[in-house]
Design a protein with these regions (language model features):
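Alpha-helical transmembrane segments of integral membrane proteins, especially early/N-terminal helices
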Residues: 13-16, 20, 44-58, 81-91, ...
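Juxtamembrane membrane-water interface segments of multi-pass membrane proteins
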Residues: 28-51, 68-74, 101-113, 174-194, ...
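Membrane-interface helix-loop-helix modules in multi-pass inner-membrane proteins
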Residues: 52-123, 144, 221
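Long, contiguous internal "core" modules enriched in hydrophobic/ aromatic residues
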Residues: 102-249, 260-266
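Hydrophobic alpha-helical transmembrane segments
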Residues: 156-171, 291-309
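Juxtamembrane non-transmembrane "cap" segments at the membrane-aqueous interface
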Residues: 258-280
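Short, membrane-exposed interhelical loops at transmembrane-helix boundaries
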Residues: 275-297
């Protein structure tokens, strides 16, 4: 395995981590106006992700930075061609951060309701658009001989791209519902579990159709296995949610996301951005990678700092592992409403 291939695999792992961790953040934000019946419950839902949401976004920054450094041609074509959807995603992520900071600053139901709506919007847009973007990358986009994207926004809003967006939206919502059930107690936890079962009834057929179409059009024997495993994991998560086994259900949805990313990246190989204009114009791992020396330096940096980051993030999740119960008190500091877990059992 050469270094370019190593970094292609590592970028796939980074996206997997981002979708697993930020996926339940998006899901909680999407469900906030519907699952939380009053301000106390909505505050409790926000508190489940309060200590970790910003750390989860580090995976996105790392994936983007790794793409820029290891595959500069891929980064240039991707971010110039997809600039509008990526700009919308960036704006939505900024809105989410502002919501966490400002929601509890004013004692006004109207103020908080408006920020809850903004948090919903800032969660649903990335959840939808990430699926649209990755589906189009696998499908192939119009790229000319100079590796310049020649399409427009409507080019990306094809039926396959929109189906991919609906799949990620459904999976992240399901992931967030199960996470809420896992991290809370009482009626809120039970309501989240029931919601997860209902969302799964939409997520399972959507994911099945998307994976089937993907494998029929772009698949290969190895990714047939990962696609089938993703479907099994999703069905297993649904069964676990029905039986009230939130831990197993969360593991199932996490595995579904990891295996789905593995399927998409496996189908991409050896391309990183296929051209629908001509296969000769496609960006590949070989022609889009950085110089060998750059990849060597990056590999040593990753070897040193990746374990440190993983250890810190693992410690964060361990510290805030307890379930949250009841309306949480107001936060005395800036940031999400409460940054300390409140009572409850592990």
């Amino acid at each position: 395995m050469n270094l370019a291939t190593f970094w292609f695999i590592l970028i796939a792992i980074l996206w997997s981590g981002y979708f697993v961790l930020e996926g339940f953040d998006f899901g909680v934000g999407i469900l906030l106006p519907f699952l939380g019946k009053d301000d106390g419950e909505r505050r409790t839902m926000i508190n489940t992700i309060g200590p970790v949401w910003d750390g989860n976004e580090v995976w996105l920054l790392t994936a983007g930075g790794a793409t820029f450094a290891a595959f500069p041609a891929w980064y240039a074509t991707l971010f110039s061609g997809f600039y509008l959807p990526l700009l919308i995603i960036l704006a939505a992520l900024i809105i989410r951060g502002v919501c966490f900071e400002f929601r509890s600053k004013v004692e006004s139901p109207r103020w908080r309701a408006n920020w809850d709506r903004a948090l919903f919007l800032g969660s649903v847009l990335p959840a939808l658009l990430w699926g649209v973007a990755f589906a189009n990358i696998v499908r192939g986009v119009p790229i000319n001989a100079a590796h310049v994207y020649t399409g427009n926004l409507l080019t990306l809003l094809n039926w396959y791209g929109l189906l991919g967006g609906l799949v990620t939206l459904a999976l992240f919502t399901l992931h967030g519902a199960i996470f809420t059930a896992l991290r809370t107690t009482g009626e809120l936890s039970q309501r989240a579990r029931r919601t997860a079962v209902r969302v799964a009834l939409a997520a399972v057929p959507l994911a099945a159709v998307f994976l089937a179409v993907t494998q029929y059009s772009h698949g290969r024997p190895a990714t047939d296995v990962t696609a089938a495993a993703a479907a099994v994991a999703l069905i297993g998560a649904t069964v676990a949610a029905i039986r009230g086994r939130e831990g197993w259900a969360f593991t199932g949805t996490a595995l579904t996301l990891v295996l789905a990313v593995a399927t998409l990246f496996g189908n991409l190989w050896p391309n990183v951005m296929p051209s629908s204009t001509s296969a000769a114009f496609s960006l590949t791992v070989a022609n889009a990678s950085a110089a060998h020396y750059t990849l060597v330096v990056m590999s040593w940096v990753a070897l040193v700092f990746t374990p440190v980051v993983l250890a810190y993030q693992g410690w964060t999740y361990w510290v805030f592992r307890k379930r949250l119960s009841g309306p949480a008190p107001e936060a005395p500091v800036a940031g999400p409403d409460v940054v300390e877990p409140v009572g409850g059992r592990p």
